[in-house]
Amino acid sequence: MAVLASWVWVLAGCFCAAVAEVSDSSDPYPPLWEDSPEQLSDYMMEDGNYIINPWVYTDRMGMYRILLEETAMYFAKYGPENEQNLLWGLPLQFGWQYQSGRLADPTGMTDCGNELNESLCVSVDSWWADINYYLSVIPFLAAVDSGITGISPNQITILPPPKDQMRFCYNVSDCQSAVPGTMNRWRDFFQYMQLNSSDFDGLLNYLWEAHASSLDYPTSAFGDRYNFYSEKEANFEENWAIAVNYLAAARLPTTQNRTYSFQRGLPPRVLVDTDIAPFIPDFTPLQNEVLVSLKLLGDTDRNSGSLSLTLWENLMSTKLARTLFLKAFEEFLATSS
């Protein structure tokens, strides 16, 4: 438990140091945000259907942008300009994956994401892209099915990747069969959002339940993708997926500025075997420290058989505990500024 606590407080320090670094940022948006579809009519249409290719960066980002637009009214009471919308965590995370080269073909066998003329290509061989598929297409389809966009799910056509087509789902009925728990949790989130009685803490709870559920299938289904990466990057991927469960228990608010700030601590490129944190020379001290913290968490989780996660979930089971934890973020921020 002491090891777990040390990771939590190190990560809290990393988070707040990152917030302090970019608190004056005037552009907390993902790359190519303005070039991504803002409304469904910005996508190509065929036979009355909107055609979305999630293997093109801007097409996939467009699904997030539309979700942010369509759900803005439900977050207006929590702050201006949609900044408090909890869905910001998804496009900002996807944008970091793109900017750091993690959506490109890790095998090097194609130009996808690796050459200028293929810069928007999202590779089906990318572990990050495959995991993110279930954090983009699934919530989007669940939102459409929940009436958020005002159109029928039958009006959406999701295009398949060039290979491994059977490892993905493409419409509401198929995804409901393939990942029923995940679809249900995202639908619960969007339906709860539309209730007059919904509140911020309730939204956080539903969001993180859906987010964590979204990783259940792909993290097991795409384990073969680890073979395409260095041991250091593969280990980082495993640790990142583990960390999501701990962040979910703490219900960290994935608002725009918080998420954008936090990501300054994430590695700016794909890791190679010679990278040894905290001594990676082209990474900032913060980025090095985050890698060390994530490794500590991952090792603790694996060595304890996830008992550490159970203990952490029990610790974070009350609103008071979560409030105190979030307050610690603010205290670290105050001392860092």
From Swiss-Prot:
Keywords: Developmental protein, Glycoprotein, Secreted, Signal
Protein name: Protein LEG1 homolog
Source species, domain of life: Eukaryota
Family named by the database record: Belongs to the LEG1 family.
Signal peptide segment: 1-20
Pfam families cross-referenced by the UniProt entry: Leg1
Name of the gene: Leg1
PANTHER family: LEG1, PROTEIN LEG1 HOMOLOG
GO CC list: extracellular space
Xref: InterPro entries: Leg1 (IPR008499)
Function recorded in the entry: May be involved in early liver development.
Sugar-bearing residue positions: N171
Cell location: Secreted
